[in-house]
Every structure is written in C-alpha cells, then in structure tokens.
Amino acid sequence: MASQGSVTAALRVAEVLESIANRCVGPEGGQVLCTKPTGEVLLSRDGGCLLEALHLEHPLARMIVACVSSHLKKTGDGAKTFIIFLCHLLRGLHAIGEKGKDSFTSENIQSHERHWKNCCQWKSISQALQTFQTQTLGCIVDRSLSRHYLSVFSSSTEGRKLCRHSLELLLEAYFCGRVGRNNHRFISQLMCDYVFKCMACESGVEVFELLDHCFAELNVGVTGLPVSDSRIIDGLVLPRDFSMYCPADGDIRMVIVTEILQPQFSSAGSEFVLNSETQFQASQCWITDRTKTVMNHLRGQNVKLLLTSVKQPDLVIYCARLNSISVVECLSAEEVSLVQRITGLSPCVLPEVASQCEISDSTLVKFCKPLILRSKRYVHLGLISTCAFIPHSMVLCGPVLGLVEQHERAFHGAFKMLRQLFTDLDLNYIIQTKQQCNPSPLAYDNSRERNHSPETDKYQDIVAKSKNKLETQTHLEVYSGLGASDTELRAGKPWSAHKKTPIAPSQTDEMLKCLPPERSGIIDNCDLSIENHSTGNPTAEDTGTEISFEHLQVSDNAGKGYTLPVMRKSLDTCTCQGYCSSTVPAGCVLPVGGSFEILMSYYLLSYAKQCRQSDETVISMLIADALLGIPKILYKPKKGKDSFPHIYMRSLHALQASQPMVSGQSGFESVAGKYQLLTSVLQCLMKILTIDLIINIKRQPQKTADQESEDEF
C-alpha cells in the first residue's frame, strides 16, 4: 500500500501529536495520562517522554518523533514546542499550496502529474529553507536579537561569576513544564544547590559535560519515600554493597584493578599439566602464598580500599579481611571511568601489584563507609577531585518508580540544557550587498603612512595584488552598535548615492569599538575609500560604513568573528559576499513566555519587508507567523491585559520605541537552546518536504533471541 507524501499528510500527523502537546505545554498545562504498549500507565508533563511512549504506525509520525528525540539528546529541552512550531509551519505551507492549487486544476493534467508538480514545488521550498537557515537566519540573530540578550553571569571586578538568582529563575522555568506543580519549585531549588556544590570554578562547561555523560552513575533513585526526602550527598554513591568492609581510620588509600589478583594455574592459550595430587597441593599452596603476599604488599602501601571491575575469588576476599582492606567488586565500565575522571587514577596492573615496588596508581579518599537508603545498602566514597567537578551524588525519592523516573529524566535534561547554555553557540551566515562600483583605479591616501603596521601592510599587499591581477574592488562593512536597525536588514538593496565623508582615525576606532569582539575581526574585500551610503531617503541615516585601510585596525580576536573574502570582478554593479562567523556567548538568556518567538517574528518580518528576493520573503514570513503560534498557546488561558493580543501589542510598541520588553511570566530560557530548536524544526521540515512517496510494508514482528531459543528447545 503506497500513499503520496505531501504537506497535507504530514499536517494531519503533526496535528495529532500537537493535540497531545497542547494539553501539557506552559505553566498552565496539565498532565497527560496514557498507556504504554506494555500496559504500563504513564502520567506525565514531559513532552519527550509522552512522545516516546506512543505506539506509532505512520512512518511520518515515527520520523517526526525521531527528530524530536535527536533534538532532545543535544539540548534536553523543547519537545512540545518542537511539535507546535512544526505544526504551524506545515499549516503555513498548506495555505501556500492551496493558493497555488488553481494552476494545477486543468483538465488535461492527470492526477499523478499534479502530484509530481507539487513535489517539485515542495522540494524547491525545502532548498529555499536550507539556504535561508544557513545564510540568513544566523545574521538576524547576530545583528538584531543580540541586543536583547541577558546573562546568567554577573559582572564584577573579579571577573565573570554565575548569578545564583538568575540560575534559579532559569531552572524554575525549565522544571515548570516537566514536573508537577507541587514539586517543581523544590526540584529546581535542589538542582540549583547541586550545581553550586559541584562546580569548583565558574566556567562550568567541563562540569556539565561530566554530569550529562555520567548522570546515571551520579544519581540514586529511591522509591517508597516522599519527594521532599530527596537530597544531595557529598561524595560518590555506588549502587552495591561491600564484598568486604573493614572500618578504617587515618589516611585511606584506594586502588583500582581490572583483573583477578589471585594467580591462575595457567594463562589463556596454555595448559597446566598435573601428574599427581602432590603437585596439585603444592600448586595450591603456591597460589595461596602468592595471593597473601600481594595483599600484604597492598597493606604495606597503606591501601585500605580495593575497587575491582571483576569478581575476585574467595581467597582474595579472605586475605583482604586479614589485612583490613575493604573490597568493592563488579564495578561497571562507566563507574570505573567516572572514578578515573574524578581522581585521575589509572587501574593497577597485576605485575605492579605483585612486585615489591611502590604502587604509583593509588590515591587518597576522605572516607569509605556503607550507606543505607530504604533498606538497600550502598557504598559511599569520599573521593578527592583533581578536576573542576566536586563529587556529589543526587538522591531522588518518590512514592512510586514512575515519578522517580520522571524526575530523573527532568534532571538529566536540565544538565543537557545547562551544558549547551555554558558553551558558545557558533553562528555562520553570509552578508550580500549590491552597489554601483567605480572601475577607476583605486586611490591611496598619504595618511596610510601615518598608520603603518605589519598587519595593515599585509592586507594592503593583498588588495594591491588583487587590483593588478583581477581588477577587483572589495568592501568592509562595519555596523555600529550591538544590534541592527531595520535598514540594516536588507538583502541586495542598491544604494542610490555615495557620499564621500572624511573620517578621523579616532572616529574609526570608536566605530570599531562598537563592534562586539566576535565581529571585530570581519575582513571583507575592501574599497580603499570611506563612503556613507544613503538609503534613498535624504532624512534617513544609514549605519553601514565603508572604511579605508588607512584607518583600518586589524583585530587579533581570532576565532570569534571573521569574514572570508570573496573576490568579484569589477563591473558596473558588483556583489560583495562575506562569509561571517559569530557566536551566541555562553550564558545568554531571554525572559520566558514567548519573548524569543515574538522578537524573532518581529525581526523576520522586518527582514521580509526589505527583501528583494521573493523566496526569502516567503520563507521569512512563513517562519515569523509560525513562531507566533507558540506564545498564542502559552497565553491562551490568560484574559484581559495578560492575554496574547495585549502582550503582543505592548511588545511591538516597546520594540518600535527601542524600549525593553516586559514579559508576562517570570523566568529565563536559554537563547542557544531556542535557536537550536528553531534550526532543528526547520531541518525536520526539510526532510518532510523531500518525501515523494510513502510505502507501507506489512511484516511479522521479528522474533527476539529469547523466543528463538525457546523454539529451538
């Protein structure tokens, strides 16, 4: 059975998923009760958990949920918003398709021909979406949205410092949509305390990478207790009991082994021949003596704790008790890796342990004791950290296992979100301008002699060589201020006049200072003259300025912002194209409650109004309208001044008057996470638009290994 892949089919599937997401989105959302295919009942507000619990048969639905899961693995946030935003984009495309439907209704066109024409149309839109995402979207974020950034870091004379209040607002907004109303404040406060206890420095990137990667080993779930009993424990908690526990005082040294300490009769690939019982008993005595010697040597090195990834023979445990050495067996590879990352300790090899030389691979621990949580015994280790992470374990309690698992999932997602927040997000885009070029020879000013430096000489030689060989002219665009006005967001707009304006070096330096560090290194093909370009309106003032090399200060800010020059032949109308790279700095946030969506919609519409290319205009308006669907749902329960129309109009008035926006909700959300969500949804939409045909294949479910083994018997 085959069906045509179309926007209409995808919209029907997405609307079913949207009906689930709408019920639990936002602070006013409720919990959704569903039954898993296994018969287990799930009550949750976590969008990712609900989507993964669905038994989906439609291939488009499975593909959409797979895209959501892939996004959550990176960011840990945005599952419900993903579905809502995608659904609004599909509605917009469906409306576009309905408008152009008349061109395909001729009687002499067969149905399959109309289908392939539609496929070609959607594929062209998919290509336009990809071009817009890779070449334009980052520019709008970098030049317009950046002026509204807030930060979770507080500036002080000592440098960047994480603000606890900002982190609390960020985490409270995050957990508000994932756990019940009765617990989200307690959970967010617990998470905030955990972050500050684990961080040895303010950077946090290394800490959150470790917390994300080793979350299962740093978390302990306990059922049968209220959520309020959840707490933070200093040190590392291993979910197993001691094979041998010997209380120890004073300095406690620890070693890790990954092999059996008791010598074997023979090694792998060889055989040991015994001709008599006497030889066997003699061999047994030698093995016993050798094992005792190894354990005595460990005691002589003040080793009082032995961690092993394999199960040791009873003789090793017996000798450990004689030497007052505690033993913890059967550590997983992940647990061994975590201990190694925290302590910097490498596993001991058997020859080193068996010899009488000093054991180098050992470390001190603060304490080593058993821990009992709800009748279960655990190993509690006080590890001394050699990295930025101070070891602490999280004990999450709940009356039932399902609630504990939901809180564990929410915590893990929060660590992913914070990991991305504390990392700079790269933005890559292209600047394109069209203007009238003067093919006359390039003029040099004598002031170049006064601003002489090796860097400027290097770039002057490049431009001179370009002039002699390719007869090219190049341009350097510098934008004053952190954000761009509406006139700066034009694509390919020709300037009607050029006005020569002398600019002093001090003024040029001031303009360069206005650029953020990540954009101060923009080096385009530059015209060696200073020109102000009018916008055609004699009363309007353009902020785009071309700067000559005699006033150019080359930035050493490598890795933050740069533009690769693209040479164009000198014509009456030349196009300058700069490949720019910038970043969303670590710690950037916006007020929660649709601020990101309203701001991006506003700047996308401003860009669409000044766009000369029709496809970019359509894409900009499509994304802008779809983004507004998210705050509409968030403010749907609100009435009066708190309703969406009032919030939206106040936001527009504030933007037009260059005043700060006022959010209707308290809390913050990560800018990097929201931008990643936007790009992930666009990539999912591109996949949907490239589907021509959906073929359903009915087959028997594959047998598992257990079923096959039973059939064999």
Curated annotation (Swiss-Prot):
Organism classification = Eukaryota, Metazoa, Chordata, Craniata, Vertebrata
Keywords for this entry?
A: ATP-binding, Cell projection, Chaperone, Nucleotide-binding
Stated family: Belongs to the TCP-1 chaperonin family.
Intrachain S-S bonds: none
Query: Which organism encodes this protein?
Result: Mus musculus (Mouse)
Q: What is its main location?
A: other
Q: What is the name listed in the Swiss-Prot or TrEMBL entry for this protein?
A: BBSome complex assembly protein BBS10
Share what the entry says about its subunit structure, partners included.
Answer: Component of a complex composed at least of MKKS, BBS10, BBS12, TCP1, CCT2, CCT3, CCT4, CCT5 and CCT8.
Give compartment(s): Cell projection, Cilium
Q: Which Pfam families match?
A: Cpn60_TCP1 (PF00118)
Matching entries from InterPro entries are given as: BBS10, Cpn60/GroEL/TCP-1, GroEL-like_apical_dom_sf, GROEL-like_equatorial_sf, TCP-1-like_intermed_sf
Q: Name one GO molecular function term.
A: ATP binding
- Function as written in the Swiss-Prot or TrEMBL entry: Probable molecular chaperone that assists the folding of proteins upon ATP hydrolysis. Plays a role in the assembly of BBSome, a complex involved in ciliogenesis regulating transports vesicles to the cilia. Involved in adipogenic differentiation.
Gene Ontology CC, one term: cilium
What is one process in the GO biological process aspect for this record?
A: protein localization
List the Gene3D superfamilies: GroEL, GroEL-like equatorial domain, TCP-1-like chaperonin intermediate domain
Instruction: List the SUPFAM superfamilies hit by this protein, alphabetically.
Output: GroEL equatorial domain-like
